[in-house]
Amino acid sequence: MEYNFDVNSDAKKFEPYYLKCICTGWAHEGLRANWQKRLRTVQNEIGFEYIRFHGIFNDEMAIYSEDENGNPKFFWQYFDELFDFLKEVKLKPIFELSFMPEAISTKPHTLFWWKGNACPPTDYDKWAQLVKATVIHCVERYGIDDVLEWKWEVWNEPNLGSFWTRTQEEYFRLYQVTVKAIKSVDKRFAVGGPSSSGADFRDNLNYLKAFIDFCSAEKLPLDFVSAHPYPTYWPLDTAGNEQMGYMSKNCNIEHLDLIRDIIDHSPYPNAEIHLTEYNTSPSPRDLIHDTLFPAPFLLYNLTQNIGKVDSLGFWTFTDIFEENGPGESQFHGGFGLMNVLGIRKPSYFAYKFLADMGSNLVYRDENCFATKKDEKLHILLWNYCYYSDALQAVTEAPYHFTAVMMCLKIRNFHLQFILKTRKQLKHTNLAGITAVHCIIGSEWEHPKVLPRSRPLS
């Protein structure tokens, strides 16, 4: 594999959309000192613009309650502590409006270890009061200029029964009430949804289309659309149990093309596209997350999808993430760029390298990304090998790694330079492996089978 570059090559400006948004699990986790320490490191070393998380209206945040007469009461202490910190580290929210406070929740249906209420409100007027009071409080505390740059996302994954217990039409009503409440404070605020996901990406797209059609029919504002393009699906095994499977190598490229096409040909062609969750899988106990594989996976997909969407938020920056409860070990297959102790995983360095690359494109392909920054040529190389069929099967075969010879030739480079090698920068060794069916870690040195990830319940 040979690459030839000329330092004098022309470069094309692009928007580094992959640095727009980083994600985390649950608002209340953001009050913890170790969570804040990890996020401060991420911002110092990488630097994202937005952050997105679940559960700002969970009862642990104590925002909403009612007096003895059933009138809404609002409490902002924990909210202010969290958002003051986010402002300190230069992050703006993609503000996911979830979940339902127990005081106005219909028959409780909770999900996750921290029990988010995935139900519609008993009283849509009280929900509107909560949303409007939150927006007004944000304007009063942080100023209209700051809040105008925020994004307001209505709910999370309402097309999945575990996240929304009622019908599609009921979610559309929630969006209608919510967007009107927000726009009543200032019509310039950016509001969107539906934050759809799914075991089958076609279901995700169908929900998105129906949502856009509803907004158009009701003449509702739609400033951005959001979705979650995980590269997985959930087929049934021979016993009828769901098992996580992996789509094709280029599924994310195809999915983002489809979303882009839907918006371009919709009544909202100028709507932004924010993909507010993304990872190699939607399982918080997928041991692949702790291996080398996510790094070349990210480098390939993030560089190949430049120019298609406005953000693609990595889920999540830390393994301090408790949807399934606290992680059982230091490396438990958590989503994070860092583990619970703050150890940077290979996925972390994928983002770190991209952050160092600048935003003037010289060249890209499956294993290479070249840019110019400050009149300097930056070249990033990796070896991207997708999942093998053996990932899903028992195998007695030894594991094989495929070495790739890369020849790099640079013309018109007259200054002294140092090509940093693997020995000099160990963390730059992000080469993929042909068969990703071994796990790195003391507990998993010689596994014969990967533990199968399970869908969230």
Label each residue range with its predicted role:
Residues 90-93, 107-118, 157-159, 227-240, ...:
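A short small-residue
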Residues 66, 70, 114-122, 162-166, ...:
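Short coil/turn segments at secondary-structure junctions
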Residues 25-37, 59, 70-77, 102, ...:
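Acidic-and-aromatic substrate-binding clefts and catalytic sites of carbohydrate-active enzymes
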Residues 1-110, 114-151, 169-195, 220, ...:
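Non-catalytic accessory regions flanking glycosidase/transglycosidase catalytic cores in CAZymes
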Residues 318-320, 326-327:
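Secreted, luminal/periplasmic, and some membrane-associated catalytic domains
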Residues 168-312, 330:
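Noncatalytic carbohydrate-binding groove/subsite architecture in carbohydrate-active enzymes
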